[in-house]
Amino acid sequence: MTKVVVCALYKFVSLPHFESIRAPLLAMMEQAEIKGTLLLASEGINGTVAGTQEAIEALLLWLNSQNGLDNIVHKLSFDDEMPFYRTKVKLKNEIVTMGVEGIDPLKVVGTYVKPQDWNALISDPDVILVDTRNDYEVQIGTFKNAVNPVTETFREFPEYVKQNLDPAKHKKVAMFCTGGIRCEKSTAYLKEQGFDEVYHLEGGILKYLEEVKAEESLWEGECFVFDNRVAVNHDLKKGQYDQCNACRMPITEAEKQSPAYVQGVSCPHCIDKISDEQRKRFVERERQVNLAKARNEAHIGSDVNQVIEARREKKEAQRRLAAEKNNAKKSQVL
């Protein structure tokens, strides 16, 4: 069986005319039968795609021929099945959304630390180690003694820093994420906030798992990935987790035995959070999936990730509105 090559890539680079790249890039991906999503913004490119080895090599060559997109940071892994259903190239305001204006990793960023040097750094008792990923990612694996900010989205990270980190107290801060891109912005943000010694794992967790032997590793658990593999183990192979198709949370085999788990409809993480309308929609979607399987057809279904992201953005907007009202009340008192 031919292995599917999964390629995670990103590059921060000024792309003032990024909109013009979308059409030819999408056409190239479709012609090569590459699946997955790439994001384009004025600050660069980011995404994960999959295809044959020849197709991925062709994509990297194509990107290398485009002005500014040469030498893109990328990491390869392999799967027995295609982990994506669609081919997308999206235009965005940011290639990784922090929601803070003026943060530019091209101007200021933390110190890159090679995977081979990472263990020594995070073993330093003076270093505070922060996992910049979302809580559901951290739950299934992280580095030993890492701090979990318990965020739902990367947008919440600046508030975590504001409430929990102090440049006068925390002299050395080390951060990490899946592939390195979130740390480009998180370290840039901390530098802007006055933190001096700020470090991040070059290439992210995936590069560390690739280059550091398991017996020498300080990684504990599995690494969440944003595709149908759900998580990968230290060998970068599909791990033990499945994913709830309703809320996209990673779930164990034990959780799938729970009465709250109904395939495609609910799990212990979301059973009390989804509405009756959502439940009906998920039941119908699962019925369509099963019908497609019976006909030996692929069923793409609705983009649940968009639903989840919309829900999180709504909650974030509500939090911002509440904070603005609270600040307004304080101003009136003063």
UniProtKB/Swiss-Prot annotation:
<dbReference type="Pfam" id="PF00581">
    <property type="entry name" value="Rhodanese"/>
</dbReference>
<dbReference type="InterPro" id="IPR040503">
    <property type="entry name" value="TRHO_N"/>
</dbReference>
<dbReference type="InterPro" id="IPR036873">
    <property type="entry name" value="Rhodanese-like_dom_sf"/>
</dbReference>
<comment type="function">
    <text>Catalyzes oxygen-dependent 5-hydroxyuridine (ho5U) modification at position 34 in tRNAs.</text>
</comment>
<dbReference type="GO" id="GO:0016705">
    <property type="term" value="F:oxidoreductase activity, acting on paired donors, with incorporation or reduction of molecular oxygen"/>
</dbReference>
<dbReference type="Pfam" id="PF17773">
    <property type="entry name" value="UPF0176_N"/>
</dbReference>
<comment type="similarity">
    <text>Belongs to the TrhO family.</text>
</comment>
<keyword id="KW-0819">tRNA processing</keyword>
<dbReference type="GO" id="GO:0006400">
    <property type="term" value="P:tRNA modification"/>
</dbReference>
<keyword id="KW-0560">Oxidoreductase</keyword>
<feature type="active site" description="Cysteine persulfide intermediate">
    <location>
        <position position="177"/>
    </location>
</feature>
<dbReference type="InterPro" id="IPR020936">
    <property type="entry name" value="TrhO"/>
</dbReference>
<feature type="domain" description="Rhodanese">
    <location>
        <begin position="123"/>
        <end position="217"/>
    </location>
</feature>
<dbReference type="InterPro" id="IPR001763">
    <property type="entry name" value="Rhodanese-like_dom"/>
</dbReference>
<protein>
    <recommendedName>
        <fullName>tRNA uridine(34) hydroxylase</fullName>
        <ecNumber>1.14.-.-</ecNumber>
    </recommendedName>
</protein>
